[in-house]
Amino acid sequence: MIGYICKYTPVEIIEAFGEEPVRLESGYKSHERAEALIHSNMCSFAKGVLENIIENNIEEVILTACCDSIKRLYDVLKDKVKFIHLLDLPRKKDPLAIDLFYNEIIEFIEAYQAFKNKNFAEENLLKILESKSFNKEKQSAESIAILGARLKDDVIEKIRNSCTAKVINFTCTGEERVFNIEAKDNLLKSYAESLLNLTPCMRMAEDRSKLINKEFKGIIYNTIKFCDFYSYEYAELKSKADLPLLKIETDYNDSNSGQILTRIDAFLESTGIKKMEKQKAKKGYFVGVDSGSTSTNVVIIDENKNIISYSIIPTGPKALESAFKAFEIALKNAGLQEKDITSIVATGYGRVSIPFADRIVTEITCHGKGAFFIDNTVRTVIDIGGQDSKVIRLDDSGNVIDFVMNDKCSAGTGRFLEVMARTLGISIEEMAKVHKEVKENITITSMCTVFAESEVISLIAQNKDQRDIIHALNKAVASKAISLVDRIGRKGKYMMTGGVAKNQGVVYAIESRLGEKLIIPFEPQIIGALGAALISLEGK
């Protein structure tokens, strides 16, 4: 068995040796053993691959000189494994590049022959290539493209299972290895040329704009934290491609996280290609369950879209128990029994953990639906919850057409304010008061909850007025929210939802930055659950 990482690896030559090539993936939650050998600031993919090699005791590795991180991985491994080879990968596919890559493949064959003490047979390679020789399937306009850095196979499969369109994977793991070798008299050189003619990755100098079909339904673009390659292409696509575009950022130990899957599901819903079971609207009562990180909210409506009852309880250690409890309270408040309920839709981060729901829908779609129902003049929804914040753009019909999320940390969220209230020794209710008149206009320089807490402690030690500190914290939260608004562009009217919408100080700070009043619903915490209930009623 020999491990490899790159699609330009001569996998078929390894197979011709009678060996098993295994694509190395990154996805380990901990890089503890890898970080003992490689700097902690190294690319997360390279660290994950190193962790994989250590975990599975892989003794043979072939790498390509894709980037500096992979070159450093080679440096670490060259005295740790029995066999390692680094292929120099050209950036072009002109005749000189083909000659260079051909020579690199010859060097690998010679090195592997010496290591294995066996001869390479071209006839074996020819048989393998002929078995992989057929025409590639044509692209379909009714497709969604995945670009950028490689995504884990299970995430790709979830996207395929979740949408009605064909998924075309343009990342380095997506293309099927097919070959049409014509010059069989110089098999290895033709093979080298075929490898360089694979769909170009960001390592190559070839123009990748030809990959994009203008009739695609949308693009999911994956970037790696701190990787130099992909953000440049994403920025160009964002400015030039007239297609729905979703950017996700992973470090390979979080690509299957609830936040990332929420973004993907919401994107598929907004483009109209999310798989949904078709249902007819029925008479009766309809329930929306919003299982959030901090609170669980339930709304019951009737067939005329009247809110019959709702409940809000803290989300405990188990999302399912909280959902059951909130559902029971809402039923009791409405004087109903479970048998009276026609349909239930679940949303929020815990939506997949609610087995009694008939369907699940992302909170992006549900907040948009609920906000537009409350006020159909709303075009931008600012939702600040316990652990994340998001801004949602609606069209004139209330459909979600764009959204941005801050879900990587608790900066600018309800949790941020709770920590600061505890540090100040006051209740969250006291902190929610508006402090328009301040003695000193203090600025909190860090949005990181940990560092901001240290700043607050320092301000307390300097005997700063508590109201001035609260005002500074409200400004910090508002600044984070406004940065999200500006990423999708300002467009009124604005509605604020989520528990933080009850904080008058934050609301005032955001209004001051926007220069426009926010619409605050009668109960901002239930808007997601209300949207879920409306979707349950409409049966779409």
Predicted feature locations:
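Conserved phosphate-binding/catalytic loops in two-lobed NTP-binding clefts
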Residues: D242-D251, E363-I364, E511-L530
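An N-terminal assembly and electron-transfer interface module characteristic of large anaerobic redox
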Residues: M1-F286, N304-N306, G316, A323, ...
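Glycine-rich phosphate-binding loop plus the immediately following alpha-helix
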Residues: F101, T315-A319, D396-S397, I401-K436, ...
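Glycine-rich phosphate-binding/hydrolytic loop that grips phosphoryl groups
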Residues: T262, L417, P521-K540
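Glycine-rich phosphate-binding loops at beta-strand->alpha-helix junctions
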Residues: Y349, D486, R490-R513, Q525
